[in-house]
Amino acid sequence: MIAEFLVKAGVRHVAGIPGHGIWTVLDAFLDYPDLNVIQVLHEQSAAHLADGYYRASGKPIAAFASIGPGAANTVVGVATAYVDSQAMMLLTGSPHTYMRGHSVLQELDRAQWANFPRVTEGITKQVWQPSRVEQLPFVMQRAWSAMTDRKSTRLNSSHLGISYAV
């Protein structure tokens, strides 16, 4: 559903590093030949690439990263896009909903469940964490609209934390 939405929205590129927390999303990307997957050498490069692509073309692309340290590596690029009002979508992996808060799969802050989105709250327009597949169409539309709404005071980045369950 994520890949299908991005293709319908006109996204032609996604950039990131494959990892255990984002495999299912990456597998879906590979099913869409119109979606070019760019594998970068560092997650920060994916976020900067998404930011730079929007600056050069006026078209948003998605950056993706796995759980924990991989997601944390995107912060500087996402913050740069946020400060300069550039549209980009960040997709990160997240543990199964029933595993949140159990320090599994490189959760960053063991005191809080599904905690990486807390890191991006201050550097994105909004953070979404769908917990069921049925929520994806609604969440993707909201994330895209929040990111690209030109009636808003400023464009910005959106972050989706995608659970294994989704």
Region locations from a protein language model:
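N-terminal alpha/beta PP-like core and its mobile active-site loop of ThDP/TPP-dependent enzymes
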Residues: M1-S158, S163
